[in-house]
């Protein structure tokens, strides 16, 4: 055994100078090259081929030791392990140090920690989205939707200062519109309506009176008369059975006028109060339209496309469409966010005749090639104003660009801002506008009760006191403006043994659908929700709506209370709690109650008078001031006397200060009446002078002339002699030209295709 010393410089080798050979083979022959030894070494040929000495210095030491042994007869012992380790040590000394990896060096930088940077970016993104939602005026649920859409769509970019900004990719990456001129579409039939004798036999005056009773106003060319029963529409026995199964006794106002127009293949702009039955007005004609088309082949469909702004409304329309489609075995698919894209993809790939979707998810499915619009010919945009308010205009345009130009397009909504009308003109062809009631007006079938309370602290005790009586009448829907308030009300009502459920944006789609299903089935009697449930929620057992918090605007208020009093049910009641600090909303609420013919409590009027704008307008209506807004002639919103409500008397409001007003207003009305009569005669001179005394033939030809949406009544039949004598010379010339036009029109064949008043 050798004595080894280990130092920092490596292995040290100390050996004795002589060695006594007691074995038959010398150990050094394994490590000395054959060239340095004499004799035959064939027995060790396999060992001689192994290069143990890779270091040149080690080889020199061995050669010197070998020669010394040969000459002096004495050989130094070389331990194999020591030699091997010495070679490794020398290699380590001569090898260059390894280069540090760039990635590892970057991770060692404390100022650029990837985890810290990621968390910081996420935090900045959340702050940016919150600021955008605040600036956009979103409510609690819309804020959730906006943030989710931004994150899901990857709508994140950075400015020059590396601040995260939200970029709406809907405007950057729309679906390219199809080149319809290069596609050979199969011709389709859109006109399936034939008037029955009971409808075609109505005179113009009878039609006008009937529309007045329904509160219908129409504008457009060749407007069909409204029907009175579902049988007047000519539906098949299968559809009539489905209608009776749903307990539909008679059509609502919007259905009376819209059904014959849609069945005749015309585009429609339908504006009706919430809960008026708009869904059936476009679903029933859609089924007739689809049944006239050839059956779908593999990888074809849909034929009917319905777009809605929210998941809840899309699901509600989906359920309604399934009820009526079951009679013919038509397949209906619902496509909206919150559900599995994979499952929706498979369902669409299997084929369907009707698809109900939100615009965003439908765009996703189109990009995934889950469906094609080559067979689509019936498009419905429901709650169109809400879609445009939520920024869905690019998606709507993209969807429209995928559907054939000669499609039938229907646009239904409860309100119709000017920007929506402008867009409607671009995507609709020669539409007929049907308005039931005032645009954006609350449903008159709903009894509205307003309670003015000192502060928010009195809301919960009031609800706990009134809720048992409300539940006795039916289910109750409570609206709150914040998610935290919803959770608080749910907890308090649960402690008081009420069967309640909550619905807001923080709950996932599956949970929300389960909550709605339990509420509809009677498991829960009270539903507390934010405005996410305000649109499209149709529950027949719902009798009471409570506005625990006021809505953000009157349009949302109208949609909230419209969840009760559905389809003409006059038993609905809507309660609204208003605090002393909500004077501005109180003024708007007074105007809404007046327009709907509801009672205005004095305490609400007193609160509204604290709002400067409302007070100045009211003073202006009274005519007590000569300045801005004065001389209003005691007229309120939409020309309704201020204070009109239950028990209001117009005579009691007259004051001596307004005696001079009638002469001025009478002159203005005379001029207005003369201009309107002249305008209408230029359009309807082709009709007989006395339509009241003449009955129409059994098979009514399409009406000629434009029906103005400015009036409800039958002013069109008024003769020129009834107009006031404003500018006699001009009126006489206009009257003569109208008569000449009438004579020439009677001899000229009627053309169905004419430019409408909607064309620019």
From Swiss-Prot:
InterPro entries for the chain: DEAD/DEAH_box_helicase_dom (IPR011545), Helicase_ATP-bd (IPR014001), Helicase_C-like (IPR001650), P-loop_NTPase (IPR027417), RNA-helicase_DEAD-box_CS (IPR000629), RNA_helicase_DEAD_Q_motif (IPR014014)
Keyword field contains Protease: no
Listed GO MF terms: ATP binding; ATP hydrolysis activity; RNA binding; RNA helicase activity
Keyword Flavoprotein included in the entry's annotation: no
Comp. bias intervals (Basic and acidic residues): 99-109
Designated name of the protein: DEAD-box ATP-dependent RNA helicase 24
Motif (DEAD box): 382-385
Positions of ATP binding: 272-279
Compositionally biased region (Acidic residues): 41-64
Biased composition (Polar residues): 14-27, 649-666, 718-732
Domain Helicase C-terminal positions: 459-608
Positions with biased composition (Gly residues): 629-638, 707-716
Entry-annotated residues carrying Phosphoserine: 160
Sequence ranges assigned to domain Helicase ATP-binding in this UniProt record: 259-434
